[in-house]
């Protein structure tokens, strides 16, 4: 089947780029904004239609954070170039958010950890293990993702947890990960990984303050006497 039409064949008032120029970026839908970034579509669909497929396939715009090139390429019409454009845009959005709030957040409770990470990992469909690096004032230095996938000792090695902590001269860390099911009770693997990492932290002098599981609510292993 040949391509039905291109964006250039639309009336000017319906073209995303022209609408952006006339009314500003806020006048465009999510799919139109992403379509502008894509620039061109595929043989079967316009850039905006492809963008809509990407967003709906992810279950919403917020779920695109944490997506991989491989996952994005599962959408028909999305190749490596468009996947990279999207991931670059998402990373720029994340960095802009950090730049607009230069004050470092302080972690003083599990609720603070939940507030820091909920928007980033709560709705992802795979487990993302994050280590929150803290300075001596319990201010967040950074919070890198260490692994993606079901939490296990083979995936989360203490070496990988403390490598960024040592590099950043962190005084302590908080472990965190999401449960895609929404249930926040820790599994046996969660407890085993936490114990191994905490033991290693004691040896090298970087304390593991807590392990917080994010889902429908949150669970603090520290508060429940598991750490």
Curated annotation (Swiss-Prot):
Gene3D superfamilies: 5' to 3' exonuclease, C-terminal subdomain, Cytidine Deaminase, domain 2. One of its GO terms (molecular function) is metallopeptidase activity. Keywords: Hydrolase, Metal-binding, Metalloprotease, Protease, Zinc. It comes from the Bacteria. The keyword Protease applies. Belongs to the UPF0758 family. One of its GO terms (biological process) is proteolysis. It comes from Rubrobacter xylanophilus (strain DSM 9941 / JCM 11954 / NBRC 16129 / PRD-1). This is UPF0758 protein Rxyl_1530. Coiled coil: none annotated.
